[in-house]
């Protein structure tokens, strides 16, 4: 039985196994407090995210189960990876992942990014999205603060707590407003992997400009700011709007012409402008895909089609429509955690045999 130690962080009890030391608060992630710590087994620094009271409601239990399943399934260099998971005696759940020194939000608020960094970061975002989308997963909440970066400029996408299946009836109030695709704001249903491309486009623009591209004060203002730059959406996009109120609002807006992005991004390369134009398209079906973006001229310095993997298998979303009591989610969660540790132990055994230990 693992030995647990307690520490108080921001008035919150962290109850972790004695394998981890030197707890330091890092910040709040989606639905939990995050600390850095030293993993005494591997001698590496790690991030530990506490999911508070995961079994307090069926909704929270399901959300935690979903995040755990996603972290276990997604294995890619540009996606955050799970290194440990445990349930404490107080029945809080702790996810342990690799620790990266900073995130894109902090980088963007500290100094302008040079061209080669913008290219390399965008390349890694697109490489990660190609993999995630191939697994049948939509992130839904892509923004600078959940794109982690280390001192070698390695980039990893994190916070998959909101991620959902590619589902034709998706419902909507998800990502942080500035980075939210128009189809989430307008239709409240029917969206897919393209929402992540829009968000990545907003992040790309922010890397080029040093400030958010569409800093809306609310939903209405947000959409208005988007149309000032990109013009009025085409009729075939407007006609997909399901809500009568939203449709009335969009039709009441003055007709606007799309502005050339080169006028706004005066210092950007023509190839950067071209890629951005293809990402920020109202019609999701006409938006560039992650795979297409990787092959775009702007990302040529880093593009390697032999090293941009897709998922070996689709993520199993069969649990996602289940409406189960907390106790059932708890049993399923314990089962997933046991499976994770058994798989890890098996891998370690294979490593030991391979190295002759």
From Swiss-Prot:
Q: What is its EC number?
A: 2.7.11.24
**Which keywords accompany this UniProt record?**
Activator, ATP-binding, Cytoplasm, Kinase, Nucleotide-binding, Nucleus, Phosphoprotein, Serine/threonine-protein kinase, Transcription, Transcription regulation, Transferase
Q: What happens when the gene is disrupted?
A: Leads to sensitivity to osmotic stress and shows morphological defects when grown under hyperosmotic conditions. Shows also a dramatically reduced ability to accumulate arabitol in the mycelium.
Which Gene3D superfamilies does this one have? Phosphorylase Kinase, domain 1 (3.30.200.20), Transferase(Phosphotransferase) domain 1 (1.10.510.10)
Quickly give the catalysed reaction: L-seryl-[protein] + ATP = O-phospho-L-seryl-[protein] + ADP + H(+); L-threonyl-[protein] + ATP = O-phospho-L-threonyl-[protein] + ADP + H(+)
Question: Which residues of this UniProt protein bind ATP?
Answer: 26-34, 49
Q: Which residues form the active site?
A: 141 (proton acceptor)
What PROSITE patterns does the database record attribute to this sequence?
A: MAPK, PROTEIN_KINASE_ATP, PROTEIN_KINASE_DOM, PROTEIN_KINASE_ST
Q: List where in the cell it is found.
A: Cytoplasm; Nucleus
Names of required cofactors:
Mg(2+)
Family from the record: Belongs to the protein kinase superfamily. Ser/Thr protein kinase family. MAP kinase subfamily. HOG1 sub-subfamily.
Instruction: Fill in the domain comment.
Output: The TXY motif contains the threonine and tyrosine residues whose phosphorylation activates the MAP kinases.
Quaternary context: Interacts with the HOG1 pathway downstream tanscription factor MSN2.
Q: What does this protein do?
A: Proline-directed serine/threonine-protein kinase involved in a signal transduction pathway that is activated by changes in the osmolarity of the extracellular environment. Controls osmotic regulation of transcription of target genes. Does not seem to be involved in pathogenicity.
Name recorded for this polypeptide: Mitogen-activated protein kinase HOG1
